[in-house]
Each structure stands twice: as C-alpha cells, then as structure tokens.
C-alpha cells in the first residue's frame, strides 16, 4: 500500500481490513506507530494511507504552501483538481446514494435501495479533455500549459487517468478529497456558479441531504 499509494477495495487484504475488526485494529496501531492512518471512504473504489492528523504540522510545518496543499500542487493545479472533482464526484455520489448507474435509463427501481453500492466506471462518468480545455483553459492558462503542467501532474499523482481523450476518475480522487467538506461549498458557492455558466451545473443539493429528506418523508 505504501509503495502503490492506493489499493482497490477488491484486494484481498484490503477486504480483510474492512471486515475483520481485529485485523483492522492491529493495522491501525501499526500505521499510527509511524504517524500514518488508513484512509477509507466507502464510496471510493480505493483505499489509501496518509499522515495522521496530529503529525501534519510537525511534518509539513505551518507554511503558506502547506496550507494550500501538502502534495506540492500549485494554485492552478489545485483549482483544476477541484473542478474535475466537482464534475466527476458530485454526480457520481448522487448516483451512488440513489443506487443508480450510468447505464440506467432513468426508470424507477423499486429494489434500488437494496442494491449493493457500485464503484468505478459503473457510476463515475468521464470528461472530454477537449471540452474541459475549451471551458477552463482560458482562465487557467493556454491549452498546452493545462495539458502539460496541470493535467499531467494530476495524472502523475493518481487523481485522474487520461485515456483516449477522456479524463477518468483516478484512484485517489474520491478517497483523498472529502465530499462532506467540499460538496456544499461547491454547490452553493462561486464555483457552482462558474460551472453552471460553462454548461456544467452541479447537482441542486448535496446527495446526502436528499437521502435524509427522503428518509424523513418516509417516517411521516
């Protein structure tokens, strides 16, 4: 896991860590002893390791650069990362919460709530790289700069995968960026307005808020 930076949830040892409590306690203790923690988001297809919260400042310091990013991303790279996260993960999470897949025809499924949680390309759409460049390259720099300096760096770090002119979710995109912290800030913030202006409106609400409202309506 340390060498790969992430492992799929389907890996036998990852599956064991997620279901075997004794194994997980031992794993967490071993990671904690060296200042690390396992990052697990049930909606992400991969797990990862990261520095434990209490060692962030001793390791990185409280510099301005660390406050912006602890993986060495520039402001432009970080801005594009958030845009891509919003375009891929926000609709993906909505599909996951509603137990829908990209191939669904929109018809209601009476058994949808009992369906297993889907991951990967079943629920995560891909972005056209050409479309992304047309919409956002003018504000981030010229096309060559965005392709060579921004997208290439995000792909190198594992946040995205570039295949056949399309941008796909990388193994770290969903697991390292916290949906609960970011979703409302994007949906109700300036970025949501910017995305709408270029033809990529975000979902109207946080997917978890919609589910809570549905459950509340069912109780009454």
What kind of region is each of these model predictions?
Residues 46, 50-115:
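Short recognition helix of helix-turn-helix/winged-helix DNA-binding domains
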Residues 31-41, 155-168:
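A short, conserved structural fragment
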Residues 2-18, 95-136:
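Short acidic, hydrophobic short linear motifs in intrinsically disordered regions
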Residues 45-49, 166-174:
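Minor-groove-contacting beta-hairpin "wing" of winged helix-turn-helix DNA-binding domains
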Residues 57-72, 175-220:
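Short, amphipathic alpha-helical interaction segments positioned at domain boundaries
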Residues 1-76:
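Eukaryotic partner-binding/assembly regions in large regulatory complexes
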Residues 29, 64-71, 90-94, 137-138, ...:
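Long compositionally biased, domain-poor regions of proteins
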Residues 21-27, 140-157:
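Short amphipathic alpha-helical interaction segments
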């Amino acid at each position: 896991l340390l060498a790969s930076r992430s492992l799929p949830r389907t890996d036998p040892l990852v599956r064991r860590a997620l279901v075997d409590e004794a194994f997980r306690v031992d794993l967490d203790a071993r990671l904690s002893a060296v200042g690390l923690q396992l990052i697990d988001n049930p909606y992400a297809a991969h797990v990862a390791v990261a520095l434990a919260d209490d060692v962030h400042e001793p390791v990185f310091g409280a510099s301005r650069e660390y406050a912006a990013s602890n993986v060495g991303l520039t402001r432009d790279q970080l801005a594009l990362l958030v845009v891509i996260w919003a375009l891929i993960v926000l609709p993906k999470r909505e599909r996951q919460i509603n137990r829908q897949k990209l191939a669904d025809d929109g018809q209601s499924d009476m058994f949808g709530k009992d369906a297993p949680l889907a991951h990967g390309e079943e629920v995560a759409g891909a972005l056209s790289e050409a479309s992304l460049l047309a919409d956002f390259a003018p504000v981030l720099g010229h096309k060559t700069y965005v392709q060579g300096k921004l997208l290439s760096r995000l792909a190198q770090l594992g946040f995205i995968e570039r295949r056949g002119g399309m941008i796909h979710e990388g193994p770290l995109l969903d697991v390292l960026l916290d949906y609960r912290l970011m979703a409302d800030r994007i949906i109700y913030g300036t970025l949501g307005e910017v995305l709408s202006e270029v033809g990529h409106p975000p979902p109207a609400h946080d997917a978890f808020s919609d589910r809570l409202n549905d459950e509340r309506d069912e109780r009454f």
